Amino acid sequence: MKLIDLKFKTMGLIAGMCAITLASCSTDDDPVIPEPEPSVLQGSITSDLTLKSGNSYTLNGELLVKEGATLNIEPGVKIVAQYDDRVDYILIEQGAKINAEGTASAPIVMTSSKEEPGAWGGIHICGRAHTNAEGGKGSSEIGGAVYGGDNDADNSGVLKYVRVEYTGYAFDEEHEANGMTFYGVGNGTVVENCEAYHGSDDGFEFFGGSVNVKNMVVVNCSDDSFDWTEGWNGKGENLVAFQESEGTLGYDCDCLIEADNNENNYAATPVSHPVLRNLILVGNGGSKQGIRLRRGTEVEITFAKVCGKAKALAVESAETENALLNGTSKLESVSISGTLDSKEGIYTNELFVGAGNLTEQSFEYASLDDIEKECTWMNGWTK
């Protein structure tokens, strides 16, 4: 196991010395001294590294997992991003992996020494699955790493029972870091039981790819809770977003879901078409949308409750609305507070209700605890 450019405190090594005699000295009984564990993470990983269960590590700057290397993180590990003049984030490049497998009783926590939204830069994973970005390739917003390709079964590792806190670092006026960002990540990657907590950008964002996710929670992220673009077509099951009241947080959060196909080309292929099931999305008022479907995206949503936004469900662009009208996209057993808002007037509130969905509903989700009563899979590891 070798870590290149990884900075850690130097530890002295004490080796036994062999006495010099007329006979040769045997080294059979010399002690084997293990390589010291790094306590500060920084730089580039070029071969496998394991962060041991129960330990705490400091992230000081960028941590880049390079092609061929795997970052293994055991249950109960805590990574604390040092809040200073360095930009802290973890980037998994194409051909690299992260295997972060916590448990409900010992989740992996990635947080900051400054417990405020926007304190550090989150996790960014670049895979070789598709993107409908021009040329079929893209460059990650954070770190500038290449992503995209034609291998939708690409495997970037495992994320289970992982919580990221206080992400959303602003690199400049246009680029803030999400909690977790999936760039062209394939469905060979396992993503389950993950939470984004109190970030100042999106909770989870998908740039293309086919990765499937399950049991995902976003709490109080001031931008969008879930966001997709560039042709994401994975599956999502058990998605929860909760935004505390504006009076409590001091700010109005953005959309619970913001969904695009491609900002520059609404007809770009492969078209965004995730299949989502079992959603509870609770907003904190203001002028933003609950679910915002636009820019050519397609989607299938079954069993969803959406409340707490001025526009619980908004559809925009002819491409997106026509997909709902002709059945390419499906909204089934969706209950919303208020009514559906149609920008183009193609897929209307009447059509939405006629498909068996419910409007003007009232929900009692005053706290995250109220959601946990329905979603017992959240118990024990969410915050």
PLM feature spans:
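Bacterial Sec-dependent N-terminal signal peptides
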Residues: 1-4, 15-42
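Extracellular beta-rich repeat passengers
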Residues: 32-71, 82-95, 102, 111-201, ...
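Catalytic metal-binding/acid-base residues of hydrolase active sites
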Residues: 78
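Glycine-rich loop(s) and the adjacent beta-strand/alpha-helix scaffold that form part
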Residues: 106-107
